[in-house]
Amino acid sequence: MYEYFTKLKEPEITPLKAGFLFLLCAVWLLTGLIGHDPWKPDEAYSFGLIYHILQSHDWIVPTLVDEPYMDKPPLYYWTAAILAKLLAPILPLHDGARLATGLYTALTLLFIGLSGRELFGKNRGWAAVIALVGCLGMLIRAHEIITDNALLTGCTMMLYGYALSLRRPTLAGVILGIGIGIGFLSKGFIAPILFFFISAALLLFREWRTRAFITTLLIAIVCALPWLTIWPWLLFQRSPQLFVDWMWTHNLGRWFGFVKGGDYHEVFYYVKILPWLAWPALPLAAWAVWEARKKIWHEPEFQLLLVSFLVMLVTLSIVPDIKEVFALPMLLPIALLATASLSTLRRGAANALDWFGIMTFALLAIALWWGWGGLLLDNNAWITHQLKNAQPGYDPDFHAIPFGIAFFATMAWVVLVWRVGRSVRRSLINWATSVTLMWILLMTIWLPWLDTGKSYRHMIDDLKDNLPKKYNCIADVRIGDSQRAMLQYFGNLNPKRNASRTCDLLLVQGDRISKPIEDEIGWEKMWEGGRKGDANERFRLYRRVKE
Protein backbone atom coordinates (compact mmCIF):
# COMPACT_ATOMS: atom_id res chain seq x y z
CA MET A 1 0.00 0.00 0.00
CA TYR A 2 3.01 2.29 0.05
CA GLU A 3 4.31 2.11 -3.53
CA TYR A 4 4.65 5.89 -3.90
CA PHE A 5 6.85 6.23 -0.87
CA THR A 6 9.08 3.20 -1.25
CA LYS A 7 10.70 4.88 -4.24
CA LEU A 8 12.33 7.37 -1.86
CA LYS A 9 15.31 6.18 0.13
CA GLU A 10 15.73 6.97 3.80
CA PRO A 11 18.04 5.72 6.55
CA GLU A 12 17.22 2.51 8.37
CA ILE A 13 16.18 2.50 12.02
CA THR A 14 19.05 0.74 13.78
CA PRO A 15 18.42 -1.29 16.96
CA LEU A 16 20.14 1.44 18.99
CA LYS A 17 17.90 4.14 17.56
CA ALA A 18 14.85 1.95 18.04
CA GLY A 19 15.83 1.42 21.67
CA PHE A 20 16.18 5.16 22.21
CA LEU A 21 12.79 5.86 20.63
CA PHE A 22 11.17 3.14 22.74
CA LEU A 23 12.70 4.65 25.89
CA LEU A 24 11.50 8.12 24.88
CA CYS A 25 7.94 6.88 24.39
CA ALA A 26 8.02 4.92 27.65
CA VAL A 27 9.20 7.96 29.63
CA TRP A 28 6.56 10.18 27.99
CA LEU A 29 3.87 7.58 28.70
CA LEU A 30 4.73 6.70 32.31
CA THR A 31 5.47 10.21 33.58
CA GLY A 32 2.52 11.66 35.46
CA LEU A 33 0.48 8.48 35.80
CA ILE A 34 1.03 8.27 39.55
CA GLY A 35 1.80 10.66 42.38
CA HIS A 36 -1.13 13.08 42.38
CA ASP A 37 -4.79 13.17 43.39
CA PRO A 38 -7.67 13.05 40.91
CA TRP A 39 -7.82 16.49 39.34
CA LYS A 40 -10.91 18.52 38.59
CA PRO A 41 -13.02 18.33 36.59
CA ASP A 42 -12.80 15.20 34.42
CA GLU A 43 -10.57 13.01 36.57
CA ALA A 44 -12.64 13.63 39.68
CA TYR A 45 -15.99 12.43 38.39
CA SER A 46 -14.43 9.63 36.32
CA PHE A 47 -12.72 8.25 39.39
CA GLY A 48 -15.99 8.57 41.29
CA LEU A 49 -17.54 6.07 38.87
CA ILE A 50 -14.56 3.74 39.30
CA TYR A 51 -14.71 4.07 43.08
CA HIS A 52 -18.35 3.00 43.07
CA ILE A 53 -17.42 -0.23 41.28
CA LEU A 54 -14.77 -0.93 43.89
CA GLN A 55 -17.18 -0.25 46.74
CA SER A 56 -20.36 -1.86 45.44
CA HIS A 57 -19.05 -4.47 42.97
CA ASP A 58 -21.76 -3.36 40.54
CA TRP A 59 -20.22 -3.78 37.09
CA ILE A 60 -23.36 -3.11 35.04
CA VAL A 61 -24.74 0.30 36.00
CA PRO A 62 -22.25 3.21 36.03
CA THR A 63 -23.01 5.02 39.28
CA LEU A 64 -21.73 8.23 40.83
CA VAL A 65 -22.31 8.58 44.57
CA ASP A 66 -25.33 6.25 44.62
CA GLU A 67 -26.94 7.81 41.53
CA PRO A 68 -26.93 6.14 38.07
CA TYR A 69 -24.66 8.01 35.67
CA MET A 70 -25.67 6.80 32.24
CA ASP A 71 -23.57 9.07 30.06
CA LYS A 72 -21.05 6.45 28.87
CA PRO A 73 -20.61 2.65 28.80
CA PRO A 74 -18.26 1.26 31.45
CA LEU A 75 -15.31 -0.43 29.69
CA TYR A 76 -12.74 2.13 30.84
CA TYR A 77 -14.20 2.10 34.36
CA TRP A 78 -14.01 -1.70 34.44
CA THR A 79 -10.35 -1.66 33.40
CA ALA A 80 -9.45 1.06 35.89
CA ALA A 81 -11.29 -0.68 38.74
CA ILE A 82 -9.49 -3.96 38.07
CA LEU A 83 -6.07 -2.29 38.02
CA ALA A 84 -6.86 -0.21 41.10
CA LYS A 85 -7.89 -3.35 42.98
CA LEU A 86 -4.86 -5.38 41.87
CA LEU A 87 -2.41 -2.60 42.72
CA ALA A 88 -4.10 -1.48 45.95
CA PRO A 89 -1.34 -3.00 48.14
CA ILE A 90 1.29 -0.71 46.58
CA LEU A 91 -0.58 2.27 45.09
CA PRO A 92 -3.44 4.54 46.12
CA LEU A 93 -6.66 3.61 44.37
CA HIS A 94 -6.64 6.68 42.13
CA ASP A 95 -3.06 6.03 40.98
CA GLY A 96 -3.85 2.41 40.22
CA ALA A 97 -6.93 3.49 38.28
CA ARG A 98 -4.91 6.01 36.27
CA LEU A 99 -2.68 3.20 35.03
CA ALA A 100 -5.65 2.13 32.89
CA THR A 101 -4.95 5.28 30.91
CA GLY A 102 -1.34 4.16 30.55
CA LEU A 103 -2.52 0.78 29.26
CA TYR A 104 -4.86 2.25 26.66
CA THR A 105 -2.37 4.91 25.58
CA ALA A 106 0.31 2.23 25.15
CA LEU A 107 -2.08 0.30 22.90
CA THR A 108 -2.77 3.49 20.96
CA LEU A 109 0.95 4.01 20.36
CA LEU A 110 1.35 0.36 19.34
CA PHE A 111 -1.42 0.46 16.75
CA ILE A 112 -0.51 3.89 15.38
CA GLY A 113 2.99 2.50 14.84
CA LEU A 114 1.63 -0.60 13.11
CA SER A 115 -0.58 1.63 10.96
CA GLY A 116 2.36 3.79 9.90
CA ARG A 117 4.36 0.69 9.06
CA GLU A 118 1.50 -0.83 7.05
CA LEU A 119 0.71 2.35 5.14
CA PHE A 120 4.14 3.78 4.43
CA GLY A 121 6.77 1.09 4.98
CA LYS A 122 8.67 -0.60 7.77
CA ASN A 123 10.70 2.49 8.73
CA ARG A 124 7.59 4.59 9.31
CA GLY A 125 6.19 2.88 12.40
CA TRP A 126 8.38 4.81 14.84
CA ALA A 127 7.80 8.04 12.94
CA ALA A 128 4.03 7.68 13.38
CA VAL A 129 4.42 7.09 17.11
CA ILE A 130 6.76 10.04 17.57
CA ALA A 131 4.45 12.31 15.55
CA LEU A 132 1.53 11.42 17.82
CA VAL A 133 3.60 11.76 21.02
CA GLY A 134 4.69 15.22 19.89
CA CYS A 135 1.14 16.51 19.40
CA LEU A 136 0.43 19.09 22.08
CA GLY A 137 -3.14 17.88 22.47
CA MET A 138 -1.96 14.47 23.65
CA LEU A 139 0.27 15.65 26.46
CA ILE A 140 -2.20 16.16 29.31
CA ARG A 141 -5.19 14.17 28.08
CA ALA A 142 -3.17 10.99 27.48
CA HIS A 143 -2.34 10.92 31.20
CA GLU A 144 -5.79 11.57 32.69
CA ILE A 145 -8.47 9.27 34.10
CA ILE A 146 -10.88 9.74 31.19
CA THR A 147 -12.72 7.35 28.89
CA ASP A 148 -11.51 9.21 25.81
CA ASN A 149 -8.20 7.34 26.02
CA ALA A 150 -10.01 4.03 25.54
CA LEU A 151 -11.96 5.52 22.62
CA LEU A 152 -8.66 6.64 21.11
CA THR A 153 -7.37 3.07 21.33
CA GLY A 154 -10.49 1.81 19.58
CA CYS A 155 -10.14 4.38 16.80
CA THR A 156 -6.46 3.51 16.33
CA MET A 157 -7.31 -0.17 16.01
CA MET A 158 -9.98 0.74 13.46
CA LEU A 159 -7.45 2.66 11.37
CA TYR A 160 -5.01 -0.22 11.52
CA GLY A 161 -7.77 -2.63 10.51
CA TYR A 162 -8.56 -0.49 7.48
CA ALA A 163 -4.88 -0.19 6.57
CA LEU A 164 -4.39 -3.95 6.81
CA SER A 165 -7.59 -4.88 4.99
CA LEU A 166 -6.23 -4.94 1.44
CA ARG A 167 -3.41 -7.32 2.41
CA ARG A 168 -4.77 -9.53 5.23
CA PRO A 169 -8.56 -9.14 5.27
CA THR A 170 -9.36 -11.74 7.93
CA LEU A 171 -6.97 -10.39 10.57
CA ALA A 172 -7.91 -6.85 9.58
CA GLY A 173 -11.59 -7.61 10.14
CA VAL A 174 -10.93 -9.01 13.61
CA ILE A 175 -8.86 -5.97 14.63
CA LEU A 176 -11.35 -3.55 13.09
CA GLY A 177 -14.26 -5.23 14.88
CA ILE A 178 -12.50 -5.21 18.25
CA GLY A 179 -11.64 -1.54 17.71
CA ILE A 180 -15.31 -0.74 17.07
CA GLY A 181 -16.24 -2.64 20.22
CA ILE A 182 -13.68 -0.92 22.42
CA GLY A 183 -14.75 2.46 21.10
CA PHE A 184 -18.43 1.67 21.68
CA LEU A 185 -17.96 0.37 25.22
CA SER A 186 -15.86 3.44 26.02
CA LYS A 187 -17.89 6.36 24.65
CA GLY A 188 -21.02 4.95 23.06
CA PHE A 189 -22.23 5.21 19.49
CA ILE A 190 -19.48 7.42 18.06
CA ALA A 191 -17.20 4.50 17.07
CA PRO A 192 -19.91 2.54 15.16
CA ILE A 193 -20.99 5.78 13.45
CA LEU A 194 -17.40 6.49 12.37
CA PHE A 195 -17.10 2.91 11.10
CA PHE A 196 -20.26 3.23 9.01
CA PHE A 197 -19.37 6.52 7.34
CA ILE A 198 -15.66 5.78 6.81
CA SER A 199 -16.48 2.40 5.26
CA ALA A 200 -19.20 3.88 3.04
CA ALA A 201 -16.90 6.68 1.88
CA LEU A 202 -14.01 4.31 1.10
CA LEU A 203 -16.30 2.19 -1.08
CA LEU A 204 -16.63 5.20 -3.39
CA PHE A 205 -13.03 4.58 -4.51
CA ARG A 206 -12.17 1.85 -6.97
CA GLU A 207 -9.14 0.78 -4.93
CA TRP A 208 -11.38 -0.17 -2.00
CA ARG A 209 -14.17 -1.89 -3.94
CA THR A 210 -12.50 -5.27 -3.61
CA ARG A 211 -13.51 -8.64 -2.27
CA ALA A 212 -10.81 -8.36 0.41
CA PHE A 213 -12.23 -5.10 1.77
CA ILE A 214 -15.82 -6.38 1.75
CA THR A 215 -14.60 -9.49 3.61
CA THR A 216 -12.90 -7.26 6.17
CA LEU A 217 -16.09 -5.28 6.77
CA LEU A 218 -18.23 -8.39 7.21
CA ILE A 219 -15.78 -9.96 9.66
CA ALA A 220 -15.54 -6.65 11.54
CA ILE A 221 -19.31 -6.50 11.99
CA VAL A 222 -19.39 -10.08 13.30
CA CYS A 223 -16.50 -9.44 15.71
CA ALA A 224 -18.04 -6.18 16.94
CA LEU A 225 -21.47 -7.66 17.70
CA PRO A 226 -20.60 -9.12 21.14
CA TRP A 227 -19.13 -5.79 22.21
CA LEU A 228 -22.18 -3.94 20.91
CA THR A 229 -24.83 -6.16 22.47
CA ILE A 230 -23.77 -7.91 25.70
CA TRP A 231 -23.50 -4.91 28.04
CA PRO A 232 -26.63 -3.16 26.64
CA TRP A 233 -28.56 -6.42 27.07
CA LEU A 234 -27.35 -6.82 30.66
CA LEU A 235 -28.27 -3.21 31.35
CA PHE A 236 -31.75 -3.75 29.89
CA GLN A 237 -32.20 -6.84 32.04
CA ARG A 238 -31.25 -4.83 35.11
CA SER A 239 -33.46 -1.84 34.32
CA PRO A 240 -35.29 -1.04 31.06
CA GLN A 241 -35.62 2.56 32.25
CA LEU A 242 -31.85 2.94 32.72
CA PHE A 243 -31.32 1.39 29.29
CA VAL A 244 -33.61 3.98 27.70
CA ASP A 245 -31.94 6.69 29.77
CA TRP A 246 -28.53 5.67 28.43
CA MET A 247 -29.41 4.97 24.79
CA TRP A 248 -31.95 7.70 24.14
CA THR A 249 -31.79 10.43 26.78
CA HIS A 250 -27.99 10.73 26.92
CA ASN A 251 -27.06 9.62 23.40
CA LEU A 252 -29.33 9.23 20.37
CA GLY A 253 -32.14 11.43 21.64
CA ARG A 254 -29.76 14.27 22.50
CA TRP A 255 -28.21 14.09 19.05
CA PHE A 256 -31.54 14.09 17.20
CA GLY A 257 -32.71 16.98 19.34
CA PHE A 258 -29.51 18.88 18.60
CA VAL A 259 -29.82 18.31 14.83
CA LYS A 260 -33.48 19.32 14.86
CA GLY A 261 -32.72 22.46 16.83
CA GLY A 262 -30.08 23.55 14.33
CA ASP A 263 -27.82 25.31 16.84
CA TYR A 264 -24.50 25.01 15.01
CA HIS A 265 -22.69 28.05 16.38
CA GLU A 266 -19.68 25.91 17.39
CA VAL A 267 -19.50 23.85 14.21
CA PHE A 268 -16.03 25.26 13.37
CA TYR A 269 -14.65 24.79 16.89
CA TYR A 270 -12.31 21.94 15.95
CA VAL A 271 -11.09 23.74 12.85
CA LYS A 272 -9.99 26.58 15.12
CA ILE A 273 -8.24 24.48 17.78
CA LEU A 274 -6.57 21.83 15.61
CA PRO A 275 -3.63 24.09 14.60
CA TRP A 276 -2.33 24.02 18.19
CA LEU A 277 -3.87 20.71 19.27
CA ALA A 278 -2.16 18.81 16.44
CA TRP A 279 1.05 20.87 16.33
CA PRO A 280 3.58 20.08 14.87
CA ALA A 281 1.98 17.15 13.02
CA LEU A 282 -0.64 19.29 11.25
CA PRO A 283 1.71 21.39 9.08
CA LEU A 284 3.68 18.25 8.22
CA ALA A 285 0.45 16.50 7.25
CA ALA A 286 -0.58 19.47 5.12
CA TRP A 287 2.80 19.34 3.37
CA ALA A 288 2.38 15.63 2.64
CA VAL A 289 -1.04 16.24 1.10
CA TRP A 290 0.26 19.14 -0.99
CA GLU A 291 3.32 17.25 -2.19
CA ALA A 292 1.24 14.24 -3.28
CA ARG A 293 -1.69 16.30 -4.57
CA LYS A 294 -1.56 14.89 -8.12
CA LYS A 295 -1.90 11.31 -6.90
CA ILE A 296 -3.71 11.90 -3.66
CA TRP A 297 -7.08 10.47 -4.68
CA HIS A 298 -5.51 7.47 -6.40
CA GLU A 299 -3.35 6.24 -3.51
CA PRO A 300 -5.21 4.00 -1.00
CA GLU A 301 -3.21 5.29 1.97
CA PHE A 302 -4.18 8.89 1.30
CA GLN A 303 -7.77 7.94 0.57
CA LEU A 304 -8.00 6.20 3.94
CA LEU A 305 -6.41 8.97 5.98
CA LEU A 306 -8.17 11.90 4.34
CA VAL A 307 -11.56 10.18 4.43
CA SER A 308 -11.03 9.23 8.09
CA PHE A 309 -10.05 12.77 9.04
CA LEU A 310 -12.93 14.40 7.17
CA VAL A 311 -15.50 11.95 8.56
CA MET A 312 -14.20 12.50 12.10
CA LEU A 313 -14.18 16.28 11.67
CA VAL A 314 -17.72 16.48 10.31
CA THR A 315 -19.19 13.87 12.68
CA LEU A 316 -17.65 15.32 15.83
CA SER A 317 -18.60 18.87 14.82
CA ILE A 318 -22.35 18.16 14.71
CA VAL A 319 -22.85 16.71 18.18
CA PRO A 320 -24.41 18.40 21.24
CA ASP A 321 -21.16 18.50 23.24
CA ILE A 322 -18.13 20.23 21.73
CA LYS A 323 -14.96 19.92 23.80
CA GLU A 324 -11.25 19.97 23.07
CA VAL A 325 -10.76 16.42 24.36
CA PHE A 326 -13.26 15.05 21.83
CA ALA A 327 -10.87 16.01 19.02
CA LEU A 328 -8.29 13.39 20.04
CA PRO A 329 -9.32 10.83 17.36
CA MET A 330 -8.57 13.40 14.65
CA LEU A 331 -4.93 13.42 15.74
CA LEU A 332 -4.55 9.86 14.44
CA PRO A 333 -4.91 10.47 10.67
CA ILE A 334 -3.03 13.76 11.07
CA ALA A 335 -0.07 11.99 12.71
CA LEU A 336 -0.05 9.33 9.99
CA LEU A 337 -0.14 11.96 7.25
CA ALA A 338 2.74 13.73 9.00
CA THR A 339 4.62 10.44 8.78
CA ALA A 340 4.20 10.52 5.01
CA SER A 341 5.84 13.95 4.81
CA LEU A 342 9.24 12.73 6.01
CA SER A 343 10.20 11.49 2.55
CA THR A 344 9.58 14.80 0.81
CA LEU A 345 9.99 17.50 3.47
CA ARG A 346 12.63 20.04 2.50
CA ARG A 347 15.65 20.10 4.77
CA GLY A 348 15.27 23.85 5.28
CA ALA A 349 11.72 23.44 6.54
CA ALA A 350 12.79 20.58 8.81
CA ASN A 351 15.64 22.68 10.23
CA ALA A 352 13.30 25.63 10.81
CA LEU A 353 10.85 23.44 12.73
CA ASP A 354 13.75 21.91 14.65
CA TRP A 355 15.24 25.20 15.76
CA PHE A 356 11.84 26.68 16.55
CA GLY A 357 11.14 23.73 18.84
CA ILE A 358 14.55 23.81 20.51
CA MET A 359 14.46 27.54 21.21
CA THR A 360 10.84 27.50 22.39
CA PHE A 361 11.30 24.61 24.78
CA ALA A 362 14.66 25.88 25.99
CA LEU A 363 12.98 29.13 27.03
CA LEU A 364 10.11 27.21 28.64
CA ALA A 365 12.55 25.00 30.56
CA ILE A 366 14.43 28.06 31.81
CA ALA A 367 11.14 29.66 32.88
CA LEU A 368 10.05 26.52 34.73
CA TRP A 369 13.36 26.21 36.58
CA TRP A 370 13.42 29.94 37.32
CA GLY A 371 9.85 29.95 38.61
CA TRP A 372 10.42 26.89 40.78
CA GLY A 373 13.60 28.34 42.21
CA GLY A 374 11.86 31.63 42.92
CA LEU A 375 9.09 29.89 44.85
CA LEU A 376 11.58 27.80 46.81
CA LEU A 377 13.84 30.74 47.69
CA ASP A 378 10.92 33.16 48.11
CA ASN A 379 12.55 35.91 46.07
CA ASN A 380 10.76 39.09 45.07
CA ALA A 381 10.65 38.43 41.33
CA TRP A 382 7.47 39.31 39.45
CA ILE A 383 6.97 35.72 38.30
CA THR A 384 7.19 34.49 41.89
CA HIS A 385 4.43 36.85 43.00
CA GLN A 386 2.23 35.74 40.10
CA LEU A 387 2.75 32.07 40.96
CA LYS A 388 1.94 32.69 44.62
CA ASN A 389 -1.23 34.53 43.66
CA ALA A 390 -2.25 31.67 41.39
CA GLN A 391 -1.89 29.10 44.20
CA PRO A 392 -2.22 31.04 47.46
CA GLY A 393 -2.22 27.90 49.60
CA TYR A 394 0.98 26.41 48.19
CA ASP A 395 3.81 25.86 50.67
CA PRO A 396 7.05 25.27 48.70
CA ASP A 397 9.43 22.59 49.89
CA PHE A 398 12.51 20.87 48.46
CA HIS A 399 12.23 17.19 47.55
CA ALA A 400 15.47 15.54 46.50
CA ILE A 401 14.13 12.74 44.28
CA PRO A 402 11.87 14.90 42.06
CA PHE A 403 14.66 17.47 41.82
CA GLY A 404 17.17 14.81 40.81
CA ILE A 405 14.86 13.41 38.12
CA ALA A 406 14.14 16.88 36.74
CA PHE A 407 17.82 17.87 36.72
CA PHE A 408 18.91 14.64 35.03
CA ALA A 409 16.16 14.96 32.41
CA THR A 410 17.20 18.53 31.64
CA MET A 411 20.85 17.60 31.21
CA ALA A 412 19.91 14.60 29.08
CA TRP A 413 17.77 16.83 26.86
CA VAL A 414 20.64 19.27 26.32
CA VAL A 415 22.88 16.40 25.23
CA LEU A 416 20.25 14.75 23.03
CA VAL A 417 19.22 17.79 21.03
CA TRP A 418 22.84 18.30 20.04
CA ARG A 419 23.60 14.64 19.40
CA VAL A 420 20.62 13.61 17.26
CA GLY A 421 21.89 12.96 13.75
CA ARG A 422 21.18 15.37 10.91
CA SER A 423 18.07 14.11 9.10
CA VAL A 424 14.53 15.16 8.35
CA ARG A 425 13.37 12.95 11.21
CA ARG A 426 15.45 15.00 13.63
CA SER A 427 12.82 17.75 13.91
CA LEU A 428 10.14 15.28 15.03
CA ILE A 429 12.44 13.50 17.47
CA ASN A 430 13.70 16.72 19.03
CA TRP A 431 10.17 18.04 19.36
CA ALA A 432 8.92 14.86 21.06
CA THR A 433 11.97 14.87 23.34
CA SER A 434 11.33 18.50 24.27
CA VAL A 435 7.65 17.87 25.00
CA THR A 436 8.69 14.98 27.22
CA LEU A 437 11.11 17.23 29.12
CA MET A 438 8.37 19.78 29.79
CA TRP A 439 6.10 17.02 31.07
CA ILE A 440 8.83 15.65 33.34
CA LEU A 441 9.45 19.10 34.84
CA LEU A 442 5.73 19.63 35.43
CA MET A 443 5.28 16.19 36.99
CA THR A 444 8.32 16.43 39.29
CA ILE A 445 9.32 19.82 40.67
CA TRP A 446 6.01 21.47 39.76
CA LEU A 447 3.68 18.66 40.80
CA PRO A 448 3.04 19.89 44.39
CA TRP A 449 2.13 23.34 43.06
CA LEU A 450 -0.27 21.86 40.50
CA ASP A 451 -1.78 19.40 42.96
CA THR A 452 -2.53 22.21 45.41
CA GLY A 453 -4.80 23.88 42.90
CA LYS A 454 -6.45 20.83 41.35
CA SER A 455 -7.04 18.50 44.31
CA TYR A 456 -9.95 18.58 46.76
CA ARG A 457 -8.13 16.59 49.45
CA HIS A 458 -7.14 19.49 51.74
CA MET A 459 -10.50 21.21 51.45
CA ILE A 460 -12.37 18.02 52.35
CA ASP A 461 -10.03 17.33 55.28
CA ASP A 462 -10.79 20.82 56.57
CA LEU A 463 -14.52 20.23 56.11
CA LYS A 464 -14.39 16.96 58.06
CA ASP A 465 -12.54 18.66 60.91
CA ASN A 466 -15.44 21.10 61.23
CA LEU A 467 -18.26 18.57 61.14
CA PRO A 468 -20.13 18.01 64.41
CA LYS A 469 -19.52 14.66 66.06
CA LYS A 470 -23.15 13.67 65.71
CA TYR A 471 -25.47 14.51 62.85
CA ASN A 472 -28.23 12.83 60.91
CA CYS A 473 -27.27 13.53 57.29
CA ILE A 474 -25.93 16.22 54.96
CA ALA A 475 -28.08 17.75 52.25
CA ASP A 476 -26.39 19.31 49.24
CA VAL A 477 -27.21 22.38 47.18
CA ARG A 478 -25.60 22.87 43.74
CA ILE A 479 -22.72 20.47 44.42
CA GLY A 480 -21.26 19.26 41.11
CA ASP A 481 -20.57 15.68 40.09
CA SER A 482 -16.80 16.00 40.46
CA GLN A 483 -17.11 17.51 43.91
CA ARG A 484 -19.59 14.87 45.11
CA ALA A 485 -17.25 12.13 43.91
CA MET A 486 -14.31 13.57 45.84
CA LEU A 487 -16.41 14.13 48.97
CA GLN A 488 -17.16 10.43 48.94
CA TYR A 489 -13.58 9.34 48.18
CA PHE A 490 -11.59 11.62 50.48
CA GLY A 491 -14.19 12.21 53.18
CA ASN A 492 -16.56 9.24 53.03
CA LEU A 493 -19.32 11.86 52.81
CA ASN A 494 -22.47 11.32 50.75
CA PRO A 495 -24.51 14.53 50.66
CA LYS A 496 -28.10 13.91 49.62
CA ARG A 497 -29.86 15.85 46.91
CA ASN A 498 -33.19 17.54 47.67
CA ALA A 499 -32.95 16.61 51.34
CA SER A 500 -32.80 20.02 53.03
CA ARG A 501 -36.11 19.37 54.79
CA THR A 502 -34.89 16.18 56.47
CA CYS A 503 -31.13 16.64 57.04
CA ASP A 504 -29.68 18.64 59.90
CA LEU A 505 -26.61 19.78 57.91
CA LEU A 506 -26.51 21.55 54.56
CA LEU A 507 -23.49 21.82 52.23
CA VAL A 508 -23.71 24.50 49.55
CA GLN A 509 -21.38 25.04 46.59
CA GLY A 510 -21.19 28.56 45.21
CA ASP A 511 -18.91 31.45 44.33
CA ARG A 512 -16.79 33.67 46.52
CA ILE A 513 -19.56 36.24 46.97
CA SER A 514 -21.53 35.18 49.99
CA LYS A 515 -25.13 34.86 48.86
CA PRO A 516 -28.03 33.77 51.02
CA ILE A 517 -28.97 30.17 50.55
CA GLU A 518 -32.47 29.08 49.69
CA ASP A 519 -34.67 29.55 52.75
CA GLU A 520 -31.73 30.68 54.89
CA ILE A 521 -34.04 31.18 57.84
CA GLY A 522 -33.43 28.33 60.22
CA TRP A 523 -29.80 27.70 59.17
CA GLU A 524 -26.52 28.86 60.69
CA LYS A 525 -23.22 28.87 58.78
CA MET A 526 -20.55 26.91 60.65
CA TRP A 527 -17.79 26.56 58.04
CA GLU A 528 -16.64 27.97 54.72
CA GLY A 529 -13.74 26.78 52.57
CA GLY A 530 -12.52 25.70 49.18
CA ARG A 531 -9.55 24.46 47.23
CA LYS A 532 -6.42 26.44 48.03
CA GLY A 533 -5.84 27.35 44.41
CA ASP A 534 -9.38 28.53 43.62
CA ALA A 535 -10.75 31.62 45.32
CA ASN A 536 -13.97 31.56 43.29
CA GLU A 537 -15.27 28.07 44.09
CA ARG A 538 -16.51 28.08 47.69
CA PHE A 539 -18.25 25.55 49.90
CA ARG A 540 -20.36 26.51 52.91
CA LEU A 541 -21.60 24.21 55.64
CA TYR A 542 -24.77 25.08 57.54
CA ARG A 543 -26.51 23.45 60.46
CA ARG A 544 -30.16 23.61 61.26
CA VAL A 545 -31.03 25.96 64.08
CA LYS A 546 -33.48 24.52 66.53
CA GLU A 547 -36.39 26.79 67.19
At which residue positions do the language-model features occur?
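Membrane-integral, polyisoprenol-dependent glycosyltransferases
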Residues: Y2-N351, R531-R538
